[in-house]
Swiss-Prot record:
Segments forming domain UVR: 203-238
Gene name of the encoded protein: uvrC
Boundaries of every GIY-YIG domain copy: 16-94
Keyword Zinc-finger on entry: no
Pfam family, one: GIY-YIG
NCBIfam families named among the record's database cross-references: PRK00558.1-5, uvrC
Leader sequence residues: none
Protein name, entry field: UvrABC system protein C
Alphabetical list of SMART domains matching this protein: GIYc, HhH1
Localization, UniProt: Cytoplasm
Subunit structure: Interacts with UvrB in an incision complex.
Amino acid sequence: MSSVFNAQSFLRTVSSSAGVYRMYDVKGDVIYVGKAKDLKKRLSSYFRKNLDNVKTQALVSHIHHIDVTLTHSETDALLLENDYIKQYMPKYNVLLRDDKSYPYILLSQHEHPRLAYHRGPQREKGHYFGPYPNGGAVRESLHLMQKLFPIRQCDDLYYKSRSRPCLQYQLSRCSAPCVGKVSNADYDEQVKLASLFLKGKDQQVISTLVAKMEQAAQQQEYEQAARFRDQIMALRKVAEQQEVSNNKGDMDVIGVHYASGIACFHLLFIREGKIFGSRSYYPSVPAQTDMDEVLRSFILQFYLNADIQRTIPKEVVISHNFEELHELEAAVSIALNKKFSIKTNVRADRASFLRLAVTNATNAVITRLSHKNTVEQRFVLLEEILELSTPIYRMECFDISHTMGESTVASCVVFNREGPHKGEYRRYNIEGITPGDDYAAMKQAITRRFDKIEAGGKIPDILFIDGGLGQLRIAQKIVDEKFVHLDKAPQLIGVAKGEGRKPGLETLILGDTETSFSLEGDSPALHLIQHIRDESHRFAITGHRNRRQKTRNTSTLESIPGIGPKRRKALLQHLGGLQEVKGASVAELVKVPGISIEMAQTIHDALRG
């Protein structure tokens, strides 16, 4: 316990009412938020002699002071606790990092509506279907929709610029409303059917199409009847592949597995009785946290996150029973202003879905533990090979990417003992050097990375340089300069490519002694080095390609007299890209806002010349 904090004096002032407490460290940071029916009783438990919980011991040792907020009821305390956890993100609380907005399928409000992927604020008018658990689920659904319903998926600018059908029409994946290949009535009918399908009413869609097929056959419109028949067969095939519940309602089914410090909540999103999607969540759980706290924290943080656009069903089925379940139901219902039910003992279809969710959660934890153990073993082997006296907690790797000196980008990727730490990745756009000078590029990147480094900052234990002795010397010189007044500096290691750039033939060079050595091709430590090197290369080349494309788009158009940033943007947006601008006729260029007939001719001549 902190010597500054007088627990006995503090406890004499604490009420026995319900409420929330916030524990602070000496820096004034909130390190834990908790709630209690009886604050005095709960807080007293932290300061008993012989605490047997390691987490509690560590927490108490860092307490500098505690703030208390009284509430009218335990339900109010639950809600306030959740608000404080979201606000302060305390290190000793269970934290669910679920800050990405969820993707939707948008059916736009247009004369000829389009289906599109959407993430973010819902500003465009139309109907939004979702949310989907991830972007892959949306793209997969859109791909399926293209096969089932000939509705356009192009953006409005592309739609307006068409003078003839695109490839999607030839593939029977769009009915080409842009050039009048389908009547408005027929297109609207397909839009209605697509909307019903996205709502999960596929049997209603099939029944409608069967009636239309029979009507077309009676009227001897056999080609039309055949198209309806093919559409019905495709829909039935999709319906057969989906697991369907007799219960046609909406619910979330949550399977939970917690082992070796890793908690997984696997959610099945059941909509209209079908599995709409699934997703695994891995909240950050401090060691020896009580399972009830893990469950309570997840439910509150997941369903009461106002920053995430999420459709919340009335019913949630979860694999673990826990205390405060009814209080939790009441708290969420009050916060959402709607009925919210949590069930743990279920039968029939619900039980089947729950078993599936638990199986997925268990497998996910096993996979993570296997990966974690593999990475951990590789770190330990690397420590042994390098004869280090302290563990490696953070590694970084730098790489340079360019095309003949154009659009040079440096990457810095970060690994910890669990593998890639992508939130810490950085790219550096290299400026003001001789094109193709990799040494100067590396010097600029390393300088920018450590320019303002301080003790206690994010200092890597190992810094890999993807390159030979020359680049390593440049990096070592900068590190020596930047860390001269600090107690700790990274160990630099150059990773020189082997003969023919074949994996397993790399030469490793120590930055301080310039000693070179190689590892066996099947060495797990070498595999770790290859992993971080390859990840650095991937991250650098992706950044370089994006920068190069942006530069080429800009320079190609803005080199034309009269074309500035605004007109360049209008051309690219209206026609869909640089290649489309290059292939456009004068008549098509004139349709772009701000482009006169004379300017269109100038652009056409410049790009074709």
